Swiss-Prot record:
One annotated GO biological process: translational termination
GO annotations of cellular component type: eukaryotic 43S preinitiation complex; eukaryotic 48S preinitiation complex; eukaryotic translation initiation factor 3 complex, eIF3e; eukaryotic translation initiation factor 3 complex, eIF3m; multi-eIF complex
Residue ranges that the Swiss-Prot or TrEMBL entry lists as coiled coil: none
Superkingdom of origin: Eukaryota
Organism: Meyerozyma guilliermondii (strain ATCC 6260 / CBS 566 / DSM 6381 / JCM 1539 / NBRC 10279 / NRRL Y-324)
The protein's name: Eukaryotic translation initiation factor 3 subunit G
Amino acid sequence: MATSVIKSWADAEDEIPAAEVINNPDGTKTVINYRMNANGQKIRHIQKIREVKVKEKVHPLIAMRKNWSKYGKEKDMPAGPDARTTQLGEVVELKLGTSWKEIEKEEEEQKAEQTQQIVSNQRIKCRTCGGNHFTSKCPFKDTLISDSANTSAAATPEPDTDASGKYVPPSLRKGAGAVRDMSGRDRDDSTTLKISQLNTFVDEDMLRNELLKRFHPLQRVTIVRNRETGESRGFAYVSFVTERQAEEALNTLNGKGYHSLILHLEWPKKRKAN
């Protein structure tokens, strides 16, 4: 609150009263300070303070060292470290004893158990997509085989003629039937999307709970991984409940940024016209 206007700063130093400390019945203290603002007005500042004492139990030798008197350049300085001359480090717990070999042995056994558990979890691995299932039951074997066949065909095109020089139609060339399903019919992927340009640390849970959270429920989320290392190859296949839901995800997320990369969503293979 403003009480008066002072024209001279020299007069202000004389007219500003000292701080007042009032002890309240409830154990708190009321501190009243006065200061000058930019307009030369005297401002009264009231604070209510409650002092809390925290008791810390330490070893008697530690308490004794804290009472040692300082010497040298720190002579007559108050107790406690001075930030100008003392640099505080991290607290390190030192455990002394003769059983350190046993502790190291236990840690090695725990690491061996964790490694064995990881190996057992990765024992069943699909040779097509690297997932945790048998190769014969891979839900995306037809799509991946189709992608591999298209890539191989683009790199090494099949000749139009055989050894005798006769024309061979594409349907009768070598490997023409490799993209068909073993049952003789094509798989229905009308609700499946292929998500490319994913960061390598993105897993199935991140796709479900972060990227595709608004499009739940999801039938299946599979990240294609390297067969040898188990590392993500940068793309995944997601099966939605309805085709409309998949199309909405395609229009919403295609071209959007996700973990420093631009996503590319597409249908896994060319769909038949309605």
